[in-house]
């Protein structure tokens, strides 16, 4: 077999495996996005999707201490539920996710809103928000390193 044939086989093999890896990574990132939404009712479990150095930007505030950020979110949720007299249920809708993968880094952008069911109160639909996540692959697991949330124009 000539050097040209060997080179061609190696290049084609590399292309075959890299496209499969990209497809697997895309599927894995999409699963993390879905879990991120599905775990809105369990913020402690949702926190396991985050890197310890995650940056969180929302409502004009930037938080770089992930442990304190999650503690604040959990405490805020508990305080709201205490005022409502019971658990609030969040049903998360994620629409039109777009994901780009750059090696071990992924950028995801999507629209998110919640149907919120407070205890003993009427349900309400939150305004839609843009969510951008930056995920980093550590070993075989994708974790959220950066979250940016902002209102969709006109809200």
Which residue stretches match the model-derived regions?
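Sec/Tat-exported extracytoplasmic proteins
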Residues: 33-41, 53, 58, 77, ...
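A short, structured loop/turn motif at beta-sheet edges
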Residues: 99-107, 122, 135-143
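Short, cysteine-centered beta-strand-loop-beta hairpins and adjacent loop/turn segments enriched
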Residues: 115-125, 153
């Amino acid at each position: 077999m000539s050097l040209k044939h060997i080179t061609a086989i190696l290049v084609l093999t590399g292309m075959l495996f890299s496209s499969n890896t990209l497809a697997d990574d895309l599927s894995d990132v999409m699963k993390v996005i879905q879990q991120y939404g599905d775990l809105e009712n369990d913020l402690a479990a949702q926190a396991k999707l985050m890197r310890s150095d995650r940056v969180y930007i929302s409502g004009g505030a930037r938080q770089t201490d992930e442990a304190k950020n999650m503690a604040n979110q959990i405490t805020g949720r508990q305080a709201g539920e205490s005022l409502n007299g019971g658990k609030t249920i969040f049903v998360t809708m994620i629409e039109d996710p777009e994901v780009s993968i750059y090696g071990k880094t992924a950028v995801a952008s999507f629209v998110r809103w919640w149907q919120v069911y407070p205890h003993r109160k009427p349900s309400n639909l939150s305004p839609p928000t843009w969510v951008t996540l930056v995920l980093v692959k550590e070993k075989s697991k994708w974790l959220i390193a950066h979250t940016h949330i902002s209102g969709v124009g006109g809200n």
